[in-house]
Amino acid sequence: MSDITNEKKPLNSDPEILLRKRRNADRTRLEKQELARQRQEQRKKEQIKNKKKFIRAESLVANSLATSREKERIKRISKLEHKKLKGDVSHLPSEKNFFLKVTEKPQSEETDDLIDEDEEDGFEREKVAYNGEEQLLFVLRVKGPVAASIPHKAYRILSTLRLEEVNTAVFIKLTETTFSLLKIIAPYVIVGKPSLKSIRSLIQKRSKIVYKREDEEEAKEIILNDNNIVEEKLGDCGVICIDDIIHEIATLGENFTKCNFFLQPFKLNREVSGFSSLNKLKKLEQREVEKKTRKVSNASTAPIVQIDIDALIAKIN
């Protein structure tokens, strides 16, 4: 008679903590689906409401004229760049592209003597030729010309740079090709050369990535504050921590593109927000400053305005 061994077999069940996680995940998924359905219904209601909204004839005319001017500006730039590629630049005073650096004039330098017309508004302007070397630029998306719809070509460039939303920003590597793209989207962005301090501040405070954890079904946006995630995603490139990402971006290293697209576009604050009397006054002052620093030209050879981006980052970061 063979010996019968009564071995204790483990129950075919999952631990309580795993069941709780699954239950929470199911509840979260259902809540997200319900929110998505509500947003879709709200969007449909707004579309129906906008269709019935009365629009004045003056608004239609203003929108049409502003959009036509913007399309004509882009057409001129595209035509000029095409001629440059063909070498037909005999009609141009210079083949180079230019920056117009606009900086606030230090108060200590203000005197009662006669000053140039460019400096009467408190800003110094310097036109600098672009030498074709690779440079790091910080590009911030802002509102474009009043009443103008964004032309398709400009919107495609903004989408490629991941700048569909206002007050989002990215780092880009400036080359001859990207300079031409910046000329097309110039009215919709603010451009500047960031310092290492600003780069470090942005990445440490505002950096987010899309990451999928083991216990999650879908990838979601999280704050980047774990070097283990950096090593997991970028370790093959020799980038193992956040400081390595800062170094690659600041020095335009060989892994600049991978590190840059690993980060989501930076979502920054508004320079002035709120509806109090003081904030309304600040908004008026901000508009006056923008009129002086962001003068948009419809000329195809207009330089790209470059501002003191470090001062702006300190305000909105």
Curated annotation (Swiss-Prot):
Please give the chief subcellular localization of this protein.
nucleus
Spell out the GO cellular component terms annotated for this protein, sorted alphabetically and separated by semicolons.
Answer: cytosolic large ribosomal subunit; nucleolus; preribosome, large subunit precursor
Q: Where is the composition biased (Basic and acidic residues)?
A: 1-11, 25-49
User: Where does this one sit in the cell?
Assistant: Nucleus, Nucleolus
**What keywords appear on the UniProt entry?**
Nucleus, Ribosome biogenesis, RNA-binding
Its GO biological process terms?
A: exonucleolytic trimming to generate mature 5'-end of 5.8S rRNA from tricistronic rRNA transcript (SSU-rRNA, 5.8S rRNA, LSU-rRNA); maturation of LSU-rRNA from tricistronic rRNA transcript (SSU-rRNA, 5.8S rRNA, LSU-rRNA)
Chain residue ranges for the region called Disordered:
1-50
Question: What does the similarity note say?
Answer: Belongs to the universal ribosomal protein uL30 family.
What's the protein here called?
Answer: Ribosome biogenesis protein RLP7
Gene that produces this protein = RLP7
